Each structure stands twice: as C-alpha cells, then as structure tokens.
Amino acid sequence: MPVPGDDMGETPLTRTPIPMPAYFSQAEQSFSLKKRGRSLCYTLPPRPPVKSALPVSRIFPNKQRSWSQPRPQSVSFRSPQNKTPASKLYDQSKGDTFFKQCFKSICKLGRGSFGEVYKVQSLEDGCFYAVKRSVSPFRGESDRQRKLQEVRKHERVGEHPNCLRFVRAWEEKRMLYLQTELCAGSLQQHSEEFAGSLPPRRVWNITCDLLHGLKHLHDRNLLHLDIKPANVFISFSGVCKLGDFGLMVELDGTEGSGEAQEGDPRYMAPELLDGIFSKAADVFSLGMSLLEVACNMELPKGGDGWQQLRQGHLPTEFTSDLPPDFLKVLSAMLEPDYRRRATVDWLLSLPAIRNAERWRMVTLAQERTLGKIIAVYQFIVWLLSFVFQWLNRPVIGFLHYCGLRALPRSPPCSPFPNHLGESSFSSDWDDESLGDDVFEVPPSPLATHRNLTYHGQELIGRHSPDLLSRPSLGSTSTPRNLSPEFSMRKRSALPLTPNVSRISQDSTGKSRSPSTSHSSSGFVDAEVQRTLFLPRNLLGMFDDATEQ
C-alpha cells in the first residue's frame, strides 16, 4: 500500500538522512513489467572448485588426460613416455597400484612439503630402495609439468659415486613416484649422533666426497642451490652423496636464473639476495655445511650472527680447535665476494685436499675389500650348511621314522601320572554331585582297570584295609563326571595282561543305579576299592612310620 504523505506531499522517508533504496519507487506500483534475463553482473560467481579435485572447465568440454588414467605410466625424458613400468609382478587386472604390487613398504623415512619418502623392498630383486611419493595429486597440466621437472633433473645429473643414484620414476592415479637408492642416513643425522664435533679425519673425508660430487654437477653446468647436511646422504659403505635436486638449475637450459629459488637461509650465499646465481653459491653453501658439522655450531637464520658469517668473520670460540689447513679451506669457501671465492677445481688442487683424498681412497679400498671378504665368508658358511643338511637328510628321516615307531615308556617310580588320570574325566560339573558323600567317592571302572594294568605290567598288590578306607589327598575335591562313550573307548583301547582280564560290561552294569548321579558316572562298589593297590600318600606314610 502507498505510504501517506504530509501537507507538502512528502513522505516521512524523504526527510530521513538514510538514502532511499532505488527499488522503493517501484514498491508503490501494484504491477511491474516482466524482467528479462539479467546480465552476468547480477549473478553470483561460481563456487571455487576443491583444490584436491580435478579442475573442471565450465566453458570447454572436459578432456580426459592420458596422465589421469589409473594405469601406471613410466616417466622419463630420455625415452618415450606413456609406457607401463617394466615389472614381471605387475598385473593390470588387479585393483592394487604398481607400488603395492611390486614393493613391500618397510617404514616412512621422512616427509616434506613436496613429498614423503618410504623405505621399501623390491619384490622383484629383493633389494632395498627409497621411493618418494608426491603429497598431493596433480591439480592440472601445469602442476604436473612442474613436478615432473624433478625427474628430468635426476636424469640430467646422471650416475656418479658421490651423487644419489636415480633408478626410475612413474605416475599413477595423478601421483608421482621416484625410486632412488637407499642410504644409511643423512649427514645431519650422522652429526647428531656425536656428542660434539666430528673427528678431523671424518671431516676431511666428507669434504673430499662432496667436492667431487659438486664438481660433477658444475661440469654439467648444474647448480644445486640447496646444499646442506640434511640433503647429503651417507651410503652403507660410508660414502657421502649429494641428493634432493628439487631446486637445481641448469645454467645453459631454458630455465636460466629466472626460475631459480634459494634454499635454506642458514646456508644461503649473500649474493643470492641480489638475484645473482652462480657456481660460487654452491661453494658457499658447502662451506657453511662443513662449518656446522666440524664445529658442532648452530647456524643462525638471521640477525647479527648471519651478517657476520657473510662478512667473512668466523667465530674463534668454535674454530680454534680446527686444523690450520682445514681453516684455510673454510676461509676460501666462505669468501663474501663471489668473484673472489674459491672454485671446486682450485680446492681440489690444494695439497691438503690431495693428501686427504689419497687417504680417502685407501680407506674406501680397505672397506670394499673387507666387505667382499665378509660376503664370501657368509656364502661359504651358507653353502656348507646347505650341503650338510642335504647329506644328513636320509639320517634325519630315519631317526624321525624310528621316533614315530617307538612306544612311550613311563618312569617306574610313578605308575600313575596325573595327566593320565585327569585326561579321562570330563571338565563339566554336575549339580547333583555336590552332596554329603564328597570324601567317599568310589573309583570308576576305568581308573580301576588302569590301576590293575599299566602298559602291560601287573600292579596288583595288597594293602591294609584301614589305610584304604582313608581318603587320599587327591580325592578331597568334587568328583567330575565321566563320559560313557569316552570311557568305553578308553576301556577297549587298554592293553591286557595274562593275569588280569578285561572288566566285563555286565559287572559294571550291575553296579550302576539309574536313580543316582554315580550310576551315570560308572562307579563300582567300595569292596573293589579295598582290593586294589593305590599309590601311597603322605598320610599313609605317616601312619606306617607311627605303627613301626
């Protein structure tokens, strides 16, 4: 309804300081024209897609990518792609992935922002490897190409004794897998095991190994840009290897220095802040890593300490115990000016490095020789044990056959073992057996027969009637029922002696009474109990001693 106005024809809403909405003039109209389709500016924007889901285009038709297929595909920049990884164990008809069918996961070694590393055992050759799997699936073609660059960098490095060996890579279900050799641990873990600094000889060995690995990269115009103890791996033979080439840059490639990224700020060269990427940056990072492990020093991430190290000032309280030759090497590697900083070739030409390299070669030769000797010794021991078992197989089989044919014999001192008497009774309890005659329990026919015969030996004897009337120590518990079928089967299986005949079923049937619970258990009269020979208990032995 229309809003009433005043004498001037103005409504109260016109005098309010609040601006009147644009649609208020249309509110007084009873009818309005039909609105046509509004423009895109009046519609709500579409909701953003989930980051973990595949990007779906709302304009172009959804194209199925080859890498989005669930089937595994080999990734290599040397050979044609879109091939299934070569393995005899993989079956495409199964629902499991290539990783689960061909590898046995042992444990998780670590996790980073780009992937997680697992220690696995190959089911094809039985060797142990390290497999790095990407944390998140491919979000698109650009994200996939960015992650596949790490595979190309590993193939670009090639094989070298001081670089982590790359085995193969594949993609499956929009996830990237990289298989490399397995090492014993990283240099950071190795240095943390020591209470203080590493020994000088060990530091020289690490320096020689890493300089040779860095020379291999620089000869191929490759920059690592992330050298630190966490990215240096130690093999099981003690050789240090450079790894984690995710930030590596090719100087003569298409990337150039525009796509380069600096690594950890604790080991970063000062010229990287100005965007200058050169081989000298890796030399500075290697010097900072050696300073940390040699002096057991916590490197600063920033502040005055970070500036002092970049200005060539080495703290004397940490470097006073270092050898002079090694301190000279560190000073040359940590030169603030990258143009005057030492190169890898110049460092390898130093007399101290050459001397340490000769000792390193002798040490590695000794370790390899010792490893081969141990392997040959283990093979000989295994071969001798196999031949010994093969020759003694007929003898072991004959002894096993004789052991099965031999009858068990019981010791003569205990003709009534407890396990023999307890095994013939059922473990069920009878509610009617809890009566007044608990201590006066007649023996069962099966127990009577076992007392008379035991493995073919005659056990009939005489004893005092008053001693037999006393309850034994084992008869003070509530009697348990005997299964009729089980007792008949046991009774028929017992051996007989010439002097003692089998108890007839007629005699046992006469002593049973259907009105009592003892009749169902197969108990006999008490007169039979007095004529049997029972094992002596402590109470009987005490009475015999008092009578004498």
Curated annotation (Swiss-Prot):
GO molecular function annotations of the record: ATP binding; metal ion binding; protein kinase activity; protein serine kinase activity; protein serine/threonine kinase activity
Active site per the UniProt annotation: D226 (proton acceptor)
**Primary localization class, coarse:** endoplasmic reticulum
PROSITE patterns in the record? PROTEIN_KINASE_ATP, PROTEIN_KINASE_DOM, PROTEIN_KINASE_ST
Q: How is it modified after translation?
A: Autophosphorylated. Phosphorylated on undefined residues by RSK2 and Mos kinases. Phosphorylation at Thr-478 by cdk1 creates a docking site for plk1/plx1, leading to subsequent phosphorylation by plk1/plk1 and inhibition of the protein kinase activity kinase activity.
Give the subcellular location: Endoplasmic reticulum membrane; Golgi apparatus membrane
The UniProt regions of compositional bias labelled Polar residues, in chain numbering, are 63-85, 472-481
Give the matching InterPro entries. Answer: CC_SR_Kinase, Kinase-like_dom_sf, Prot_kinase_dom, Protein_kinase_ATP_BS, Ser/Thr_kinase_AS, Tyr/Thr_kinase_Cdc2_inhib
Q: Which parts of the sequence are annotated with region: Disordered?
A: 61-89, 464-523
Which SMART domains does the UniProt record give?
Answer: S_TKc
Topology within the bilayer: Peripheral membrane protein
Recorded domain comment:
The membrane-association motif is essential for the localization to membrane of Golgi stack. According to some authors, it is a transmembrane domain; the existence of a transmembrane region is however unproven.
Entry function: Acts as a negative regulator of entry into mitosis (G2 to M transition) by phosphorylation of the CDK1 kinase specifically when CDK1 is complexed to cyclins. Mediates phosphorylation of CDK1 predominantly on 'Thr-14'. Also involved in Golgi fragmentation. May be involved in phosphorylation of CDK1 on 'Tyr-15' to a lesser degree, however tyrosine kinase activity is unclear and may be indirect.
Q: What is this protein called?
A: Membrane-associated tyrosine- and threonine-specific cdc2-inhibitory kinase
Q: Which organism is it from?
A: Xenopus laevis (African clawed frog)
